[in-house]
């Protein structure tokens, strides 16, 4: 891993530590990670539901546009609700996350996470997207349960001809 990438990760982690040191932010993270709303719902909300229903962040931009701005700025690995890099964590990732656990230990601990997941949920907390999802939860849930990707619909239609 290049030193520029490691440096970027360290800068990101330092900003995450600063953000989550605030008790209210850390409590919001714990509520999100331990709450009734699944990570899949967060992902589908920002990538699909918010587009179809033109959901806005109050006083800011569209949820979907903001999400893509973050992806452009960070990459999927550094902005991921699922924390998918677990199986391939590098020594740098492990060391950085140990630093995170150590730093916020006075407030609490977050286990089994990644820098990308912490970054994604910082964006969720800063923009009160968790509150938006909660206020529209039944509609979001229905949308997700009934959602069928275009590829599947086209394949199904081809099979019926």
What spans do the regions from the language model cover?
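Alpha-helical bundle/repeat cores within regulatory domains of eukaryotic proteins
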Residues: 103, 117, 123, 143-146
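Amphipathic alpha-helical interface elements that mediate macromolecular binding in regulatory proteins
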Residues: 77, 118-123, 127, 131
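Intrinsically disordered, low-complexity regulatory segments in eukaryotic proteins
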Residues: 100, 105-115
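Long, highly charged low-complexity segments enriched in Glu/Asp and Lys/Arg with interspersed Ser/Thr
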Residues: 126-155
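Long, compositionally biased non-globular segments that serve regulatory/targeting/scaffolding roles
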Residues: 1-98, 115
């Amino acid at each position: 891993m290049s030193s520029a990438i490691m440096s970027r990760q360290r800068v990101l982690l330092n900003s995450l530590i600063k953000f989550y040191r605030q008790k209210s932010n850390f409590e919001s993270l714990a509520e999100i990670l331990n709450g009734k709303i699944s990570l899949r719902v967060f992902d589908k909300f920002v990538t699909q539901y918010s587009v179809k229903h033109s959901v806005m962040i109050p006083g800011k931009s569209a949820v979907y546009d903001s999400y893509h701005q973050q992806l452009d700025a960070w990459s999927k690995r550094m902005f991921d609700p699922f924390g998918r890099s677990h199986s391939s964590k590098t020594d740098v990732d492990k060391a950085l996350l140990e630093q995170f656990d150590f730093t916020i230990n006075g407030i609490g601990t977050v286990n089994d996470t990644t820098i990308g997941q912490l970054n994604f949920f910082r964006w969720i907390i800063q923009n009160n997207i968790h509150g938006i999802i909660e206020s529209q939860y039944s509609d979001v849930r229905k949308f997700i349960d009934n959602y069928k990707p275009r590829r599947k619909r086209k394949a199904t239609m081809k099979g019926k001809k």
